[in-house]
Amino acid sequence: MKRLAILLSALILAGCAAVGDGGDGHVSRQTATGTDAVRGAEAVFSWRAEGQMIFRCAYDDKGFFWEFVRPEGRLLDNKGRRQAVLQQSFGITARDGSSLSARIIEQGAESSPRNLRTVTFATRTSGPGMLSGIRLVVRRDAVGGMPLASCTASQRGHLLRVPFRARYVFYR
């Protein structure tokens, strides 16, 4: 059960949306469609994520497995400018210092064992700035991010960094 919870947490880390922007990540006035959580919400940013999901080789009563530790990554607008960075526990900090904490409220089906799942996060923002008022974040269209093989006794305690790309869409 512990292994499943850890795997699900890790799977929930990626995203991309079908909303347009003018290159700076600001989304033209559109409302979200798709999952129930974002239906009717307004998409305001759509940034691409590049980074790594970090896992540690751990052991429990079922054997060795890769335990999710944290993401490391940056969120870029369509011109490649850094807009935010991913933080521990699904947090995000924007370039202006505003930040949000997030918790998973919805996840999509597995598209591939190697790819993170689509996930919807409910958020709490802190500080004034570009993330102020963001209520939801959806991570979509992830490529990579998941370990493909289990770890062994000789790897216990070692870290594994799995590259990923995704799209993060922010909603008010």
Task: Annotate each PLM feature.
Residues A14-G15:
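C-terminal motif of bacterial Sec signal peptides marking the signal peptidase cleavage site
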Residues G23-I54, D61-R172:
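Primary mode marks residue(s) on the alpha4-beta5-alpha5 output face of response regulator receiver
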Residues M1-L4:
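Positively charged n-region of N-terminal signal peptides that target proteins for export
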